[in-house]
């Protein structure tokens, strides 16, 4: 999977201003997908959980939603961190949200149906 394909799946990668961090996050996701045997087509069918067999949400949708929620929460909470001189990085929040569940790509076996 290419960086362009990852950015199409997850437009939130563009929210990471630090190019080096963005590349590292993309590489981590790409490696997890490769090691798990997921390609462009199959990753769209990756389940978010194995415990709920009819779950209507895919892994990709889940990661997008969690990342969007983290971006929104950061926007609301950033002022409190700044007021209290707590260092915080939006880029790290976005990268962490995008990568929070990449382990599933290696834990779940891709099975053609």
Question: PLM features: what roles do these ranges have?
Answer:
Residues 1-113:
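Acidic/His-rich, divalent-metal-binding segments that scaffold phosphate/diphosphate chemistry
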């Amino acid at each position: 999977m290419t960086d362009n394909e990852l950015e199409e799946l997850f437009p939130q990668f563009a929210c990471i201003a630090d190019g080096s961090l963005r590349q590292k996050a993309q590489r981590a996701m790409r490696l997890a997908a490769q090691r798990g045997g997921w390609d462009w087509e199959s990753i769209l069918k990756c389940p978010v959980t194995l415990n709920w067999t009819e779950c209507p949400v895919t892994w990709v949708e889940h990661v997008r939603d969690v990342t969007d929620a983290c971006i929104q929460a950061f926007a609301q909470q950033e002022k409190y961190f700044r007021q209290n001189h707590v260092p915080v990085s939006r880029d790290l929040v976005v990268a962490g949200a995008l990568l929070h569940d990449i382990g599933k790509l290696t834990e779940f076996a891709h099975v053609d149906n």
